[in-house]
A protein has these predicted regions:
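A small/polar active-site loop signature that marks catalytic segments
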Residues: 1-147
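Short, Gly/Ser/Thr-enriched beta-strand-loop segments that form substrate-interacting elements
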Residues: 50-54, 163-172
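Short, mixed-charge aromatic SLiMs
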Residues: 40-44, 104, 154-164
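Active/binding-pocket-proximal capping segment
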Residues: 144-159, 167-168
Length: 172
C-alpha cells in the first residue's frame, strides 16, 4: 500500500532514530525537521568534526529518469527541497526557484502555482496554455528535449506504463 509523506525530512529522521534505537544505539533528544532549526553558523558546526563517509549521488539527469518513469514522488519532493537549500531556504526557496525558471521560459504567475515537488498538492495548478508554453520551450531546445523524452515511461516497456498498452498500437 502506498501513502504520501507530508514531510519527507521529518519522516526520514524519525525512521532513522527508530532504526538506531531498535539496533541498540542510544539516541538523545527528539527527531526534528531541519527547517525547524534556526540557521546555525556553518563554520562553528564543522569544528571538531571529521568526515566518516561520503556519497556522490547519480547525475541529476539519471535521477530525473528514475523519478519520472517510476513516478517517484519522494524524489520530486526531495529535488524541490534541494533547489531551495542552495539558497538556504528549504521548500520556499525551491518553489521560488522553479517559478523563476518557468518565468525565464515565459511562464509566469498566475498561470502556474507550485506548492510541492510531486504535483500532488491541491494547491498546484498549471493552465493549459502554460503547459503548452513549457512543452514548446522543451521541444525547441535540443538539450532539454532529449533529457525530457528520456524521462518519459514507454508504453508496454518500462516505468509506470510497463504493463499497460501491451499488444496495442500504443506499445513502444
Amino acid at each position: 500500500r502506498k501513502v504520501s509523506v507530508n514531510n519527507p525530512t521529518l519522516f526520514f529522521v524519525r525512521s532513522l532514530k527508530d532504526a538506531l534505537e531498535q539496533a541498540g544505539i542510544a539516541v538523545e533528544g527528539q527527531a526534528i525537521d531541519i527547517d525547524s532549526l534556526s540557521k546555525p553558523d556553518k563554520k562553528s558546526l564543522r569544528q571538531g568534526l571529521r568526515t566518516l563517509a561520503q556519497h556522490m549521488s547519480s547525475p541529476l539527469s539519471d535521477i530525473a529518469v528514475s523519478m519520472m518513469k517510476r513516478s517517484q514522488n519522494l524524489y520530486a519532493e526531495s529535488l524541490l527541497y534541494r533547489i531551495g537549500s542552495v539558497e538556504g531556504r528549504g521548500i520556499h526557496g525551491g518553489r521560488e526557484g522553479v517559478s523563476d525558471l518557468l518565468a525565464d521560459w515565459g511562464v509566469r504567475r498566475p498561470r502556474i502555482a507550485v506548492a510541492d515537488g510531486s504535483g500532488l498538492s491541491r494547491y498546484n495548478y498549471l493552465t493549459a496554455s502554460a503547459l503548452v508554453d513549457v512543452l514548446d520551450v522543451v521541444y525547441r531546445d535540443q538539450y532539454w528535449q532529449k533529457q525530457f523524452i528520456r524521462t518519459l515511461p514507454i508504453a508496454g516497456r518500462d516505468g509506470t506504463l510497463r504493463r499497460r498498452f501491451r499488444g496495442t498500437a500504443a506499445e513502444g
